Regions:
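Bacterial N-terminal signal peptides that target proteins for export
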Residues: 1-11
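Bacterial N-terminal signal peptides
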Residues: 9-19
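Short, structurally constrained coil/turn elements
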Residues: 17, 65-67
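C-terminal/domain-edge helix-coil "capping" segments
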Residues: 24-42, 48-65, 99-142
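Short secondary-structure boundary/capping segments within folded domains
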Residues: 34, 72-75, 88
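Solvent-exposed beta-strand motifs enriched in subsets of small alpha/beta binding domains
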Residues: 45-46, 84
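Short acidic low-complexity segments
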Residues: 67-79
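Mid-chain, structured segments of secreted extracytoplasmic proteins
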Residues: 77-112
Length: 142
């Protein structure tokens, strides 16, 4: 009798553990499309003095969809996403990466060719907004 109770208790404990693991994995399963659809705040940082964060922030805000999607630039490094700009000295290209903070999922990454940080910021802003538009304004099916 005692052996049967122990087996039953172990079975119940095992089922509870499996249920807990399953519920946690469903909650944490996020993909880049879901994150691109739902983020609201953006923090911009630059690893180069050639491209100021304020210039990229301004270029992002120029896009008509920026306000329509309810996006905001913040000076808080704890924003939903961080956009980081860098420049390779001696070359005319700038790299960027947009990362979702809480999940560490990279949402966009790329490189643009530009003579200076202002031109690079404009091109990076266009690339980022195109990436977001693919999930927020999907093409209609006919």
């Amino acid at each position: 009798m005692l052996q049967g109770i122990r087996i039953l208790a172990m079975a119940v404990t095992g089922l509870c553990a499996v249920n807990l693991l399953y519920s946690q994995s469903n909650e944490t399963k996020q993909n880049s499309a879901d994150l691109l659809r739902t983020f609201k705040t953006i923090y911009v940082q630059s690893k180069t003095p050639l491209a100021k964060p304020q210039i990229l922030a301004g270029e992002l805000q120029k896009n008509a969809s920026f306000d329509a999607w309810g996006l905001s630039i913040t000076s808080n490094p704890g924003a939903d996403v961080v956009v980081e700009i860098d420049h390779q000295p001696g070359w005319f290209y700038y790299t960027y990466a947009m990362t979702h903070q809480s999940s560490s999922i990279v949402l966009a990454v790329g490189r643009v060719n530009a003579w200076d940080g202002k031109q690079a910021s404009a091109r990076i802003a266009r690339e980022i907004m195109k990436r977001v538009a693919r999930v927020r304004n999907p093409p209609t099916q006919h």
